[in-house]
Amino acid sequence: EDQAAKKKKVEIYKPNKSYNIGVIDLPAFYMDFDAFSRNQFNYKSSSKDVRNLLRELKEEQVDGVILDLRGNSGGSLYEAYSLAKLFIGKGSIVQVMESNGSIQPLGHTRGIQNYDGPVMILVDKLSASASEILAGAFQDYKRGLIVGSNTFGKGTVQRLENLSYGQIKFTEQKFYICLLYT
């Protein structure tokens, strides 16, 4: 639960106007892969949680959303794609380079954009992997303002392989944002 997405509302005052801003803190891109693979409808995931938080914030009539990815070291690539679909109507989210050098777009969205209001994404030097993919997609599609320091710069896709006494992690691809190479 410490890694689960959380929301709060803040009020920002400007001369002659105040703004209600929803802040979603996302410490990790998580997904219950076991429940998902068993086709359990109510599996836990960051994209499902953020979708519910966005619905609540829309009902609360916020003027904009801040998505806080500071300290988020990444997680599920599938969740980065699923979360991007909530904000970006269509287009590829990221490109991956295979070991043979071929580049393939991943995460082509064709879904309904759940939130189309103003968005700001906060990043820092600890924002890595899936965080960088999401922030890069927002940058590519000019979907929101990216604020903070340079991110970690991971740029690789990894896969876990189960062994009889643990797991081994393989780096199998490099990732690039879609419109500009990292």
Over which residues does each language-model region extend?
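Cleft-lining beta-strand/loop regions that shape enzyme active-site pockets
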Residues: 1-164
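Short acidic, Pro/Gly- and aromatic-enriched capping/linker segments at domain boundaries
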Residues: 164-173
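Conserved small/polar residues in nucleotide/adenosyl-binding loops
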Residues: 181-182
